[in-house]
Amino acid sequence: DHALATRQVALPTVPEPTWAEPGTVGSPMSALDTHFVRLVQANPQLRPRVGNPDELRSNKLDATLDLLKHRVQVPEAGVAESRTGAVITALNEEAVVCAALANKGGLNLVVTYEAFAPKMLGALRQELIFSRHLREAGRPPGWLGVPVVLTSHTWENAKNEQSHQDPTLAEALLGEMADGARVCFPPDGNSAMVALAHSLR
């Protein structure tokens, strides 16, 4: 079956995370990057799709980009690009989140700066409503969850500061029913890897 037609997806094989030892310092996004790559490699039957408006490398998803590559019409030599790439990058937040939401039979990840995420809210809410209606009709959705990862958080105050910060999406999703949307704030790499695996259920 084509990934776009598949609606009942078995839970993926989730590799054991590469745990960081207590007291070590590391980037939660780098840990998530490594774990997502291992998740994709452990599940070749699931078509991967990564939605990203901009700056996947700045978000420390280097291994994901190197493996899956930007989808482009004319790939440049020496750049992580391919005509069949699984990373959909466009300065259109609605388009990239919808690329992941439409991949019902696949393994998805959406990553964006926090300030760009509110533009994804409409599509995410419609997906939540559609899924809830399916459950109420006795035909619960059988696809995997779509993790949406926000970076440059309001409380982080790194190099991009306020221009990349806006907690609107997290606040809006906290108001949704917990049966359809979960909001997590992983404080470190270990919890980020667990949150990623848990979000697929």
Task: Give the positions of each predicted feature.
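Thiamine diphosphate
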Residues: 1-200
